[in-house]
Amino acid sequence: LAVKRHCEQPLYDYAPPPDSQRNQSVKKSTTVILAGLTMVGPLAIDTYLPSFHAIGQDFAVSDLLVQQTLSVFLFSFAFLMLFYGTLSDSFGRRPIILGSLAIYTVASVGAALAPSFGWLLAFRCVQGLAAGGGAVISRAVVRDRASGAEAQQVLAYMMMVFGLAPAIAPILGGWLHVTLGWRSVFWFLAAFGLLMLITCYRALPESLPASSRHAFHPGLIAANYWKVLRNARFLLLAVSIGVAFSGFGLYIGSAANFVIKILGLSETAFGWMFIPLISGMTIGSALAARIARKVAPTRMIAVGYAVMVVAALANVGYNYAFKAAVPWAVLPLMLYAFGLALATPTLTVLALDVFPDNRGLAASLQSFIQMLLFALVSGTVAPLLFESAFKLACGVLAGLVLSIVCALLARRLRRA
């Protein structure tokens, strides 16, 4: 009945408290805490990658099964990203952040103590369900407390930390693995979760007053999501972003094989893969921000895709002609990440502008689709290709072609 009564109303979107209820500034300590919350997910994804082979040997399972500990985490992470924002709008930011961090910490301890592979898989699922809370709600906290240039500055700082985490995590994880064994990685994740839990409990106050909260209607939320999913142009744009970004998923899902078996490096050398990836993304993002007002959106997308095509073709050509080795095997990945960073922001804006009055809901779904495709590629496609650098390169090129086709179809729908 609630769905029927509200089906003709505007789609649900997050509305920040009125200016009179916002603080005039976000404290530096709060910014540091929020940045720390954005690290929870990337650390849980990337820190244990150097331990893949050791986990398989310890539990006597194949690399393909170990791969599913990443896939299960990503699927769980993507699923609850749809609901964390809505839950925090109804019950407040603080309870959801604290609850998700508590569950994440317990799940990390469970993974560290897992007596069998089945238990490890189960705890990774719970980890994934809990890890998205901080990443999603931290952005809402910024919107509660600040607006305009200050909000942009805080979000930029958070995104910088979010971008650095995947570069640091596998290096730290490799050191922990070599020094203390693979279980120490999950003890580290548990310690970080506990640190964030204590810090948020003591220093992060509630930012959404009770007067600004919404009633929780699961049926209405589901109906509103369905309205967005029925829009073909939005779906095409979201898929074009997700498939292009899944080039990362292919290499992250194959990271252990790519670094250790293909490149012949040690567990402590994962920086050879992740630092170029993150560097390309960071440089591309900085350039995109500087030229955003000077370059037309369609031109920005075209340049980004052109760079990605050159990178993907160079990657295929190199791995066809030569045996993969550093630094040449990772330079095309850096260039691909650079092009992706140029195209993705504009594609994201175009996707959200399909629903100009409901960008919050559209953003949640776009993030969900991106993470879902990332999980599918890293969990199902990567195991089919990760024995060969040439196959991985061809997989990235195939995904890029699909992304370009989706973007062109979305452009045609806009003209129609």
What kind of feature is each model-predicted range?
Residues 51-80:
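Extracellular/periplasmic helix-loop-helix junction of adjacent transmembrane segments
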Residues 58-60, 92, 113-119, 130, ...:
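Helix-breaking motifs and short loop linkers at transmembrane-helix boundaries and internal kinks
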Residues 79-118:
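Conserved MFS/SLC helix-loop-helix module at the cytosolic interface between two early adjacent transmembrane helices
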Residues 95-109, 300-315:
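Structural signature of the two symmetry-related core transmembrane helices
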Residues 103, 107-110, 118-126, 327-333:
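Paired small-residue
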Residues 119, 148, 156-202:
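Helix-loop-helix hairpin linking two adjacent transmembrane segments in secondary transporters
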Residues 123-164:
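Cytoplasmic helix-loop-helix junction between adjacent transmembrane helices
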Residues 207-237:
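Juxtamembrane intracellular "pre-TM" segments in multi-pass secondary transporters
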